[in-house]
Amino acid sequence: VPIPLTLGMPPSREEPRGLLTALLTRRHPTLADALAAPADTAIGDPVVPVSALTEAPAGSAATLRIVGELDVAPERLSGLYPVPVRYQLDCPAEELDVALAIAVPAPLTVYVDAGDLPETARALVGAGHSPGLPPGREAGEVADFLSVLAHAGTGFAARARDAGEVLALLAATVAALRGDDVRAALAAPDPARLTRLIPEAAAAVREILLAVEVDDPPAVARDLAGLGLPPR
């Protein structure tokens, strides 16, 4: 059932999360590197290897929200500092069954390197995990993937190579939620349509699209503004 993402209704008095708020993220080799990264409204929780979270620096690290890249066995996740709000795993397709059985103390996003994208997404959602969407997949695959995620409770994360791909992901997620043509949204994303979303509709999109990992979040945020989608 499509979700009505109304464009013109007046917003409520509460301020839900904006469409770009804390959307972008990147990988950092160490927690210190994540702490030194520039801050921006559009930049969210950094990705840091779990193996780097055993000797965290004092001070602001205590309140830092991070995503733990799962590079240690799940049974070795006690005593991490700071405690990850989400975990992330890159998984070869032949090890998908192992990933499906992993239990960690926070939501887990799994990027599978090959295989049928929507079929893999269904398996991960069924296991309670969030699928990861890699860049460069065909529009038909992405549309089928989003048809799975639009009505799942896990959401998904994605990786993008530039601001254009981030814009397309946002437009496609909106289209999937509304029951519109996802392929058309991917091919010709309309930033003006996205900026007209009321706050509640933008928040609904972000319940599905959790984060987008890019190489240079500040540059991508600037490029998104140049494409007509400033942070708000």
Feature locations, PLM:
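Catalytic alpha/beta core domains of metabolic enzymes, predominantly
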Residues: 125-187
